Amino acid sequence: MKKLIYFFVSILMLSCANVEKEASEPAVVKNSESEAISFIIDLKVNPESAEDLDGFIQEITENVLKTEDFCIEYAYYVSEDRTSVTLYEKYIDSESGVKHGQNFMASSFFDRFFNLFTLTKFIVTGPASDDFKKFTSENGFVIEYRNSVDGFVR
């Protein structure tokens, strides 16, 4: 009986160790199986703009963080000479990308954004839906679409 108890305790401990190991390993998802879409937007800073670059970036970033829980990632990357910016955005799916666009265009940030920046390139990666493409086209955005051939996300 004593050996049987030791046996069951040993099995229990080993099974718990495996669960911890499995829980700590991140899941790997192939890019081609993900619904997420990303925006890579190249911008030139308009030198005649009176808008404060750092202040604007902080303000709009805080707004997206507070109001758009469907936004996975949102970041501005500024060149050393502060004349160019790359804006990287990632959304859970195309519908979320449309919702972000609607929110942005209806906000006070829209005019301020285009006063501060000139859009030079707009790339969307991932499975952009026809509805997303229609929405952006109807609103004057010229976009290069790129689909995943291979890759992964942990």
Question: Model-found features: residue ranges?
Answer:
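Short S/T/G/P-rich N-terminal loop/turn motif that feeds into the first structured element of a domain
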Residues: 16-85, 92-102, 115-154
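Conserved serine/cysteine hydrolase catalytic core
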Residues: 112
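Sec-dependent signal peptide recognition
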Residues: 2-7
